[in-house]
Regions:
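The substrate-binding groove and active-site-proximal loops of carbohydrate-active enzymes
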Residues: 1, 24-41, 78-97, 121-132, ...
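Short, small-residue-biased leader/transition segments that mark boundaries at the very start
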Residues: 3-5
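Aromatic-lined carbohydrate-binding/catalytic grooves of carbohydrate-active enzymes
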Residues: 11-43, 64-70
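Aromatic- and acidic-residue-enriched segments that line the glycan-binding/catalytic groove
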Residues: 32-38, 51, 62-86, 136-141, ...
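An active-site-proximal structural segment forming one wall of the substrate-binding cleft
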Residues: 38-58, 80-117
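Carbohydrate-binding surfaces of carbohydrate-active enzymes
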Residues: 80, 95-107, 113-121, 132-136, ...
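Noncatalytic carbohydrate-binding groove/subsite architecture in carbohydrate-active enzymes
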Residues: 133-235
Length: 308
């Protein structure tokens, strides 16, 4: 399958873990009707990754961002009188109900049950949106009550303000940062935040942005492959990273999201090629081979193979 080939190409690069978001609005398009079939078969995705020798990281909503329609929240929530991404019980009851269907698909695949899922994310970059810790704690509680007993984590921009607002460091939830360059500076900021809270935690970039998304009426954004390889090398000498994206693919239908700048809407294009190491069709690019060369030179202990 295409999924198998793409995961194989990640393994071939010398990486050991695959990460995925879980878009609520695809799994519960219509209220109360769930779909985990075909390309939405999360269990199959995790089993496939494990069969290839890959660990997995799961980021299961409620909100995922990802330049995805409504950040992954189902459109039918807009017909409800509720405040999203908050402790509003009218919102959280739907999160809880969704988790009761979703989490049993993840729990058997946790490393604690012989599976490959290492970590699970609480919300997503909440520090860029709000600072209601009670909401984050409630999401954490629902994950734990649903049987998630691997490390939970948050991910936010690596700045003190966003880390303060979006992390649950005082609840011992692992804190990760999202950035695409200047690893030394960004990891130093994170280390400072950890130290201020009495933590000696490892440093991890949960989204190392290797390309960028594209909006209508704006030029296509490209990143030099060798410059990226150098930036990844710098990051890996200090901490761990998850490439965002390794493969971007396509926003089919109306799933392309829309951000805003002031009062101006900034809709995404249909393609989510992202100038990633695998192109929209899933083929290795120059960026892939630049990363592969860098990995072979600097991390020879990570076994590589020829890509498909």
């Amino acid at each position: 399958s295409e999924m198998c080939i793409r995961d194989s190409n990640l393994k071939a690069l010398g990486f050991n873990t695959v990460e995925t978001y879980v878009p609520w609005n695809l799994h519960e398009k219509e209220e109360g009707t769930y779909d985990f079939s075909k390309i939405l078969d999360l269990s199959h995705f995790l089993e496939l990754a494990q069969s290839l020798g890959l660990y997995a990281i799961v980021r299961p909503a409620p909100y995922i961002c990802a330049e995805w329609e409504f950040g992954g929240l189902p459109a039918w929530l807009l017909t409800k009188e509720c405040r999203i991404r908050s402790t509003d019980p009218r919102f959280m009851k739907y999160v809880k109900r969704y988790y009761q269907t979703l989490l049993p698909k993840i729990v058997p695949h946790l490393v604690t049950h012989g599976g490959n899922v290492l970590m699970v994310q609480v919300e997503n970059e909440y520090g860029s949106y709000g600072e209601e810790k009670a909401y984050l704690r409630q999401v954490k509680k629902y994950l734990e009550e649903g049987g998630i007993n691997v490390p939970l984590f948050t991910s936010d921009g690596p700045w003190q303000a966003t880390l303060r607002a979006g992390s649950l460091i005082d609840d011992d939830v692992f804190t990760t940062g999202n950035f695409g360059s200047k690893a030394k500076e960004n990891f130093a900021d994170m280390a400072q935040f950890f130290e201020a809270h009495g933590k000696k935690w490892p440093l991890m970039c949960m989204e190392f942005w290797d390309g960028w998304f594209n909006r209508w009426k704006e030029p296509i954004i490209k990143r030099d492959p060798e410059e990226l390889a150098d930036a990844v090398k710098e990051a890996l000498q200090i901490g761990s990273i998850n490439l965002y994206m390794f493969h971007g693919g396509t926003n089919f239908g109306f799933m392309n999201g829309c951000s805003a700048r002031g009062t101006i809407d900034l809709p995404q294009v249909t393609s989510y090629d992202y100038d990633a190491p695998l192109d929209e069709q899933g083929n290795p690019t120059e960026k892939y081979f630049a990363l592969k060369r860098m990995m072979a030179e600097n991390f020879p202990e990570m076994q590589q193979m020829e890509p498909w």
